[in-house]
UniProtKB/Swiss-Prot annotation:
The gene is insig2. Residues 45-63, 120-122, 169-182 are lumenal. Binds oxysterols in a pocket within their transmembrane domains and interacts with scap via transmembrane domains 3 and 4. The KxHxx motif mediates association with the coatomer complex. Belongs to the INSIG family. The record marks 108 as: Required for the recognition of 25-hydroxycholesterol. Interacts with scap; interaction is direct and only takes place in the presence of sterols; it prevents interaction between scap and the coat protein complex II (COPII). Associates with the SCAP-SREBP complex; association is mediated via its interaction with scap and only takes place in the presence of sterols. It comes from Xenopus laevis (African clawed frog). The lineage of its organism: Eukaryota, Metazoa, Chordata, Craniata, Vertebrata. It comes from the Eukaryota. This is Insulin-induced gene 2 protein.
Length: 218
């Protein structure tokens, strides 16, 4: 009888961790979908949307799956960052508070806003400016080697996938200037990876603190 109680008690933390992981992933998914819709609204001003504007009013849009893919990617990235930190034995401790995370989100949205509102002389100037802003975002809110490496990897992979989808006619940008889109897309993906990574790390740290406090009370 006592052994059964011990097994049941020991399985509770594992079950709680799985439920917390699912909840964290769901929150990251919702944040990713929300940011995808917000950033699309910013790009509408230049007619360079990643998916047609009517997706906001109809789930039956031809590209309804794009914000869902963004949400899924956001969840994967947000869960991956703290896992990589633990695997490398380098827990991220730089600016670990919610105010810093919110500022990171604001800067990320600001970078997207700049790509939509500011008129640059040419695409090269746009690329260099956004690249500098994206690296500045990493330096200000992350500064970890794992964050930089994952950000670059995410930028390369996401840009490659998006271009393959366009070339294969799965969906297309509404902008006539395709070079303009390619000049800002990698930087946006990089900054987005850093932003979702910071959110994921903060959620994981908050969850870990809650579990520690609960274990102390028990």
């Amino acid at each position: 009888m006592g052994d059964r109680e011990n097994v049941s008690y020991g399985s509770r933390p594992i079950l709680a961790q799985k439920m917390n992981l699912l909840l964290r992933g769901f929150l990251l998914f919702l944040i990713g979908v929300f940011l995808a819709l917000v950033l699309n609204l910013l790009q509408v001003q230049r007619n360079v949307t990643l998916f047609p504007p009517d997706v906001l009013s109809s789930l039956f849009s031809s590209a309804w799956w794009v914000p869902l893919c963004c949400g899924t990617a956001a969840a994967a990235i947000g869960l991956l960052y703290p896992c990589i930190d633990r695997h490398l034995g380098e827990p991220h401790k730089f600016k670990r508070e919610w105010s810093s995370v919110m500022r990171c989100v604001a800067v990320f949205v600001g970078i997207n806003h700049a790509s939509a509102k500011v008129d640059f002389a040419n695409n090269m100037q746009l690329s260099l400016t956004l690249a500098a802003l994206s690296i500045g975002l990493w330096w200000t809110f992350d500064r970890s080697r794992s964050g930089l490496g994952l950000g670059i990897g995410i930028s390369f992979f996401a840009t490659l996938v998006s271009q393959l989808l366009v070339y294969n006619g799965v969906y297309e940008y509404t902008a006539p200037d395709f070079l303009y889109v390619r000049s800002w897309l990698p930087c946006i993906f990089f900054a987005g990876g850093i932003t979702m990574g910071n959110i994921g790390r903060q959620l994981e740290m908050y969850e870990r603190k809650a579990l520690v406090e609960k274990s102390h009370r028990d």
